Curated annotation (Swiss-Prot):
The gene coding this protein: hisS
Catalytic function, reaction form: tRNA(His) + L-histidine + ATP = L-histidyl-tRNA(His) + AMP + diphosphate + H(+)
A Gene Ontology cellular-component term: cytoplasm
Protein name according to UniProt: Histidine--tRNA ligase
Pfam families tied to this protein: HGTP_anticodon (PF03129), tRNA-synt_His (PF13393)
Family: Belongs to the class-II aminoacyl-tRNA synthetase family.
Length: 430
């Protein structure tokens, strides 16, 4: 076994799997452009207090899962980002983006870090794609980010998805509900697990989000947040549902749904996949108008967004066989060197083809012609271009279509011209 191994909770992604990542990323980039979202990239680390203020001190992320350290000369703690929304909002406020354009539609595909117990689809270094729509508080804006997310899933071919949605109301609604929930849970306090006891004091709504079956049994008859909502939140939620229905997006109302981050208000949603088993969450999001105030803004910034775990997304697609038709990019031409002393001339041909925009490779190991052909077939090259003394003397090269086995002789300029025409090169004369 090699002396050095990959760090626990991280993983290597090799070329065969990179092909799958590129496919998914390509769909995301294409649909983001269709919806008018622009890509943003933020630093992988931020000051720790950014996440303490935004995510919430009662969350598992802040309490247990952040990678924090003290490299800054000022003594301020820095944290590898565990989520993207806080950093995106920080960047938007710092750059004053909304002054330039009152509506900002941003998306990202980024690396994140959490001290989680490594398991399938959950690593300590992981990737998310997501979107943030800033500057608009309307239900149509919430429906827009959900529609974008679901459109990505649809274009990727995913089946067995369920969109669960709820409203968390505004701050006053949640205060009334927190009081009612604490009153309900107080007689059961000693039966709560340690995490739920801590949440009881800081944010009892998080107990509803517990994955502990015993906690789920305790809260199954708890008051429903929906019963404590004011007219404003109810009307807002009904409009979100209306827009989703109008766009043909099926959903399931789940009054127990709360998100694991404290900054959400009004609409919250989550998407699950039947392909992921018991840990079925694929992604989710919601509205977070008050986040900007927590980060020092003088007023609220209307905002909605979502995040989806890329690793979990790929696992769901793999289990549904959605990558079976993907083929690695194959070279158009594999240049076969027939005599070792002709390598330099063959390399010049490869360079000429590449500069003409034609994908071309050459064997760099000095192997036999038979071994070169085997390598060309292994790489699924479309054509083999034979370079020998006879070919160089005549100024022509023999080109063989490796799929049809048809071949003919061509001047190099002819080969380049054929690749530039709409008809494929492999239509060679017998």
């Amino acid at each position: 076994m090699p002396h050095y191994q990959v760090v626990k909770g991280a993983r290597d992604i090799f070329p065969d799997e990179i092909l799958q990542w590129k496919h998914v990323e390509g769909v995301i980039h294409r649909l983001a452009a269709l919806y008018g979202f622009n890509e943003i990239r933020t630093p992988v680390f931020e000051y720790t207090e950014l996440f303490q203020r935004s995510i919430g001190s009662s969350t598992d992320i802040v309490g247990k899962e952040m990678f924090s350290f003290l490299p800054d000369p000022s003594g301020r703690s820095i944290t590898l980002r565990p989520e993207m929304t806080a950093g995106v909002m920080r960047a938007a406020l710092q750059k004053n983006l909304l002054a330039a354009a009152p509506v900002q539609k941003l998306y990202y595909i980024s690396e994140l870090f959490r001290k989680e117990r490594p398991q399938a689809g959950r690593q300590r270094q992981f990737s998310q794609f997501g979107a943030e729509l800033l500057g608009v508080s309307s239900p149509a804006a919430v429906a827009e980010v959900i529609t974008f997310m679901m459109h990505v899933f649809e274009d990727l071919g995913l089946q067995g998805l369920k969109l669960r949605i709820n409203t968390l109301g505004n701050m006053d609604d949640r205060k009334r509900y927190r009081d009612a929930l604490r009153n309900y849970l107080a007689p059961c306090y000693e039966q709560l697990d340690d995490a739920s006891k801590e949440r009881f004091e800081k944010n009892p709504l998080r107990i509803l989000d517990s994955k502990n079956p015993e906690m789920q049994q305790i809260v199954k008859d708890a008051p429903k947040l929906y019963d404590y909502l004011g007219r404003e939140a109810l009307d807002d939620f009904e409009k979100v549902l209306f827009y989703l229905s109008a766009r043909g997006i099926p959903f399931q109302i789940d009054h127990r749904l709360v998100r694991g981050l404290d900054y959400y208000s009004y609409t919250a949603f989550e998407v699950t996949s039947s392909a992921l088993g018991a840990q079925d969450a694929l992604g989710g999001g919601g509205r977070y108008d008050s986040l900007a105030v927590e980060l020092g803004s003088s007023g609220e910034v209307p905002a909605s967004g979502f995040a989806v775990g890329m690793e979990r997304l790929l696992i769901a697609m793999q289990k549904q066989g959605l990558f079976s038709d993907l083929d690695a990019a194959a070279p158009s031409v594999f240049v076969i060197v027939q005599q070792e002393e002709l390598f330099d001339q063959a390399l010049e041909i490869v360079t000429t083809l590449r500069r003409a925009g034609i994908s071309a490779v050459i064997d760099l190991a000095g192997r036999s012609m038979k071994a070169q052909l085997r390598e060309a077939n292994r790489m699924n090259a479309a054509n083999a271009l034979f370079v020998g003394s006879d070919e160089l003397a005549s100024g022509k090269c023999t080109m063989k279509d490796l799929r049809s086995s048809l071949q003919d002789e061509y001047f190099l300029e002819e080969i380049i011209d054929k690749f530039r025409k709409p008809e494929p090169l492999n239509r060679l004369r017998s």
